[in-house]
């Protein structure tokens, strides 16, 4: 296990997990719920992040060009090999209507070095 911290405290995260503290917190909020978000929803989050990274790169909004390239590469890799990473997106389907936990989960997995 690795320890991660945020403004709410410290959580243990499995060492090999691509997700992080926000995902652990979201899963802990609904421990008895076994159904997770539909895989197509998660893939669409990845597609939106990919499109946003490209659009902002084209618009010159990044101070460091490595950032959008890393986001694009990660999103493409996750989409191309989704079955390998599907367990990393284990946010309970009942998590609140805003999708914040799903968004944070996807951000954590995209940001993780592969």
Annotate each language-model stretch with its function.
Residues 1-114:
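Conserved, well-structured ligand/cofactor-binding cores
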